[in-house]
Curated annotation (Swiss-Prot):
Protein name: Oxygen-dependent coproporphyrinogen-III oxidase
Function: Involved in the heme biosynthesis. Catalyzes the aerobic oxidative decarboxylation of propionate groups of rings A and B of coproporphyrinogen-III to yield the vinyl groups in protoporphyrinogen-IX.
PANTHER family: COPROPORPHYRINOGEN III OXIDASE, MITOCHONDRIAL, OXYGEN-DEPENDENT COPROPORPHYRINOGEN-III OXIDASE, MITOCHONDRIAL
InterPro entries reported for this sequence: Coprogen_oxidase_aer, Coprogen_oxidase_aer_sf, Coprogen_oxidase_CS
Keywords, sorted A to Z: Cytoplasm, Heme biosynthesis, Metal-binding, Oxidoreductase, Porphyrin biosynthesis
Length: 302
């Protein structure tokens, strides 16, 4: 089972993984990615790459997977019930970067391509993805830069694209059980096929390529900033929100687990260290409080 364009998408994704890993290694200056190639009994496989104990990045995971199966899992068809139970092919690159320095934000990006097939009917395909930023000690200029890159890469595809996918990102990366945003958002899109294949693929490439343009300048600006135990403790506490979101709400995590994916690769997004504290409240007016008052409530950055 293969869509006529599967090979083009796959080669883009493999190249994207290579380029992102090379750029992150260069930004770190010390650690390198270790690769773990894996295959899946039900069909497909992937290559997981993880960097640990770096100068800048405590842990960075950049995963490529290409899987297929006999029945689309519930997480993938929840919004498309007409596709439930179809044969499927899914491929994507997903990454989560957890820096050591609390002044450097955590970042996440993902681009993916799905095909669902049923005998006697035309295959249904779509793209999805996006990127989002999770700062601990956010800076206005970083938020503006992140969203400017997002807006500019969307511009050639239509003036309504950035506002729509920015809003979707704010809504998606929201911890409903805390009524709190995970971070300052970015872009999120799914079920993209109405533009036709070429334009949809071009947009997905622009998102994948735009991630490094959005993230690396922020890393460069913040990685030398001084920090101590107070900042580290707050970073570890806020990382708890990342864990809560990924295990409770994230459709990608659920899809991976429901489709019999590789658990180590799926949970590669987890921060290496994290802590919870009962009833924590930041001191009013503190830098920690500013995250909650000035940055987490969704706002128009550009």
């Amino acid at each position: 089972m293969s869509h006529p364009h599967s090979n083009a998408v796959k080669s883009f994704l493999l190249d994207l993984q290579d380029r992102i890993c090379a750029a992150l290694e260069q930004a770190d200056g010390k650690a390198q990615f270790a690769e773990d190639a894996w295959s899946r009994e039900a069909g497909g496989g992937g290559r997981s790459r993880v960097l640990t104990g770096g100068e800048v990045f405590e842990q960075a995971g950049v995963n490529f997977s290409h899987v297929h199966g006999d029945a689309l899992p519930p997480s993938a068809s929840a919004h498309r019930p007409e596709l439930a139970g179809r044969r499927f092919e899914a491929m994507g690159v997903s990454l989560v970067i957890h820096p050591s320095n609390p002044h450097v934000p955590t970042s996440h990006a993902n681009v993916r391509f799905f095909i669902a097939e049923k005998d006697g009917e035309a295959p249904v395909w779509w793209f999805g993805g996006g990127f989002d930023l999770t700062p601990f000690y956010p800076q206005e200029e970083d938020a503006v830069h992140w969203h400017t890159v997002a807006r500019d890469l969307c511009a050639p595809f239509g003036g309504d694209v950035y506002p729509r996918y920015k809003k979707w990102c704010d809504e998606y990366f929201h911890l409903k059980h805390r009524n709190e945003a995970r971070g300052i958002g970015g872009l999120f899109f799914d079920d993209l096929n109405e533009w036709g294949f070429d334009k949809s693929f071009a947009f997905t490439r622009a998102v994948g390529d735009g991630y490094l343009d959005a993230y690396l300048p922020i890393v460069a600006r913040r990685k030398e900033q001084a920090w101590g135990d107070r900042e580290r403790q707050f970073q570890l506490y806020r990382r708890g929100r990342y864990v809560e979101f990924n295990l409770v709400w994230d459709r990608g995590t659920l899809f991976g687990l429901q489709s019999g994916g590789r658990t180590e690769s799926i949970l590669m997004s987890m921060p290496p260290l994290v802590r919870w504290e009962y009833g924590y409240q930041p001191e009013p007016g503190s830098p920690e409080a500013r995250l909650y008052t000035d940055f987490l409530p969704p706002r128009d950055w550009v």
